[in-house]
Amino acid sequence: MRLLILFLAVVTLLSLAGPGSAEVRRRRRRPPCEDVNGQCQPRGNPCLRLRGACPRGSRCCMPTVAAH
């Protein structure tokens, strides 16, 4: 009986912690592109540009160079 209660407690705790941690991971994911001196460039993988992941003026761009 104690083992069953312990098992249910562990399952309950894991189910409560699961969705929140996935949402945090999803929020931290960086976009595939970045804004480099006003131009949208792929971040890391050069193949992203060939697949059209960085269309000009797209929302995926994030400014990395501060405007002076």
Swiss-Prot record:
Residues 1-24 form the signal peptide. Its main location: secreted. GO terms for biological process: defense response to bacterium. Keywords: Antibiotic, Antimicrobial, Defensin, Disulfide bond, Secreted, Signal. Highly expressed in intestine, liver and spleen and expressed at lower levels in brain, kidney, lung, testis and venom gland. It is found in: Secreted. GO terms for cellular component: extracellular region. The keyword Secreted applies. Coiled coil: none annotated. Disulfide bonds join 33-60, 40-54, 47-61. Pfam families: Defensin_int (PF17858). The 4 N-terminal Arg residues do not affect the overall fold, but are important for the antimicrobial potency. Potent antimicrobial peptide that displays activity against S.aureus and P.aeruginosa. Does not inhibit growth of E.coli. This is Venom-like beta-defensin. It comes from Ornithorhynchus anatinus.
